[in-house]
Amino acid sequence: MENYKGLNAKYIRSESGGGRWEYLKKFPEEWVISYDDLRFKIKPMGFKHTGLFPEQAVNWDIMRGLIKNAGRPISVLNLFAYTGGATVACLAAGASVCHVDASKGMVERAGENVRLSGLGDKPVRYIIDDCVKFVRREIKRGHKYDAIIM
């Protein structure tokens, strides 16, 4: 892996299933990146993730196009929503979003990403809960959404 040009860090997996980051150059603890008009905080975590899955950007583009062209308000249920890449994209396109994840820390980071993108005043509900249990309660309540992201 050291042969990669410009390599700044590498992830070393442990036998127990976790791992650690090894920094080859001075590296910030966290930083902000931009994708179009969206902004996200990146922070390497102990389970190999950085808080964002950039390969999902093509899906964010599709969602944004569908929402913008719907011609009516769209409500989105984002399940297992992590740090909110899809939530930010949908809010930026004009949707209202219900963001659900079991991890309080990830939901807090999603809120931070929403605010970083200048969308803090947009209609979003943050729910810290088991997604399956939440969906069962939503069905009992008769609450429906135009789109569900998983």
What are these regions (language model features)?
Residues S103-A147:
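S-adenosyl-L-methionine
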Residues T83-A95:
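Conserved SAM-binding loop of SAM-dependent methyltransferases across substrates and taxa
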Residues T87, Y145-M150:
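Conserved active-site beta-strand-loop modules that form the wall/rim of enzyme catalytic pockets
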